[in-house]
Amino acid sequence: MEKLTVLILVATVLLTIQVLAQSDGDKHLMKRSKQYATKRLSALMRGHRQCIPQNVSCEEDDECCSNLECKCTSAPDCNFPKCRA
């Protein structure tokens, strides 16, 4: 049932993109909708995940909550970066 739901969502996104591409709409709007559709589809495929809060160890920026980056502040060759603003 879950696979069917994802398939329906993907089909809906693709049809929406096709309709927008064929219309005389604003090109900026089309670009935005494609970006949103891509991000939404990517999020659906990954499933639910929790973000890492500030000052907790991380490996990549994508793991950190909004407006945070995975970085070191103490030394240039830091081995344990944390999510920081």
Swiss-Prot record:
Classification via InterPro entries: Conotoxin
Signal sequence, start to end: 1-23
Subcellular locations according to the entry: Secreted
Domain comment in the entry: The cysteine framework is XV (C-C-CC-C-C-C-C).
A single Gene Ontology CC term: extracellular region
Name of the protein in its database record: Conotoxin Vx15a
Domain of life: Eukaryota
Tagged with keyword Electron transport: no
Transmembrane region(s): none
Positions bearing Pyrrolidone carboxylic acid: 50
Major place of residence: secreted
